[in-house]
């Protein structure tokens, strides 16, 4: 679902930071 994709994107942002 969009919620799952959003969660993965958020995690990627944290790792990138």
Curated annotation (Swiss-Prot):
Tissue distribution of the protein: Expressed in skin granular glands.
Using the UniProt record, give the first listed, main subcellular location: secreted
Where is it located? Secreted
The keyword Secreted belongs to this UniProt entry's keyword annotation: yes
| Top-level taxon | Eukaryota
What UniProt keywords apply to this chain's record, in alphabetical order?
Secreted
One GO cellular component assignment for this chain's record is: extracellular region
What role does it play? May act as an antimicrobial peptide.
Similarity annotation: Belongs to the Frog skin active peptide (FSAP) family. Septenin subfamily.
Q: What is this protein called?
A: Septenin 1d
Q: Which organism is it from?
A: Osteopilus septentrionalis
């Amino acid at each position: 679902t969009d919620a799952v994709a959003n969660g993965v994107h958020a995690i990627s942002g944290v790792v990138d930071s």
